[in-house]
Amino acid sequence: VLRLFGGVLYGSVVILCTTSWGSQVINSISPGLVQQHTLYYGLITFFLFMGAWECVKMMKFDPKGWEKWVVFPLIVFVFYRFSKRYFSNGFYFDFNISEILALLLIVIAVVTLFRFSKELYYDNGKLIFTVIYTALPFGFALGLPKFSTADNTFTLEVFFLFVLIWSSDSFAYFTGKFFGKHKMAPKISPKKTWEGFAGGVFFTIILGYFIELYYPDLRGNYMIVGLLVSVFGPLGDLVESQLKRNFGVKDSGNVIPGHGGILDRLDSFIICVPVVYLYFILEKLI
């Protein structure tokens, strides 16, 4: 019951903050109180700081070290740079060298986690990883939707990204449950199978086709977004599983009843957002 309640609560908050329903509900009670883009910003900001807090706790920073005092000011500074662009509608998806470098840093952080994990036992490594793993993906998440303050419109790119992530997880789970035989990463995530992965890819692309069919004005092609989500979503899960394994932690936190922490729920989102953002850049270039 607790898990069901936590899932419904989490899903409802995400839906209300990533569609126009949130501001409609609030403004029906108190007219003109909030605009949808502000709700979305609040959601992403909450996710960022809760996720960063969980990451700091999970990685066990030295209480006497200076790094634990620097991590949050650095995250605030990085996120502030993205926030300025968000409120000025400054995400153009042009080939921007600073954005490409930021995306490359995420790749380096993931490779470090799997191939050079000993670097993360030092507090300076923990500091750099935490900033990259939290501030950059959630910063890029601000750039995905389009909005207008004049008529309070807000597009559904992030809502459908969540839909694809949730659906991909479900498709992979049920396909793996009935047909799974070959383990994908038995030491990191023993329940994942290649058959489940293939089922997740196939059905998520089909779902992306229907999203593209009925919502053609969204950024990008959602069949391609579905493919990216189904491929990189499991990687996000493996990244967080490896992080928890490295530091001997079962759950990242307990903020969502029955579901663990923010990082447990958003592991796929954290990796999928930069990938989709890069796709939007490439699509505009091509």
Predicted segment positions?
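Juxtamembrane boundary at the C-terminal end of a transmembrane helix
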Residues: 278-286
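Membrane-embedded alpha-helical bundles of polytopic integral membrane proteins
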Residues: 1-227
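C-terminal transmembrane helix pair
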Residues: 243-244, 269-275
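Interfacial loop-to-transmembrane junctions
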Residues: 246-268
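Hydrophobic transmembrane alpha-helices of multi-pass small-molecule transporters
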Residues: 204-205, 265, 272, 281
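Hydrophobic alpha-helical transmembrane segments of integral membrane proteins
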Residues: 69, 133, 253, 270-271
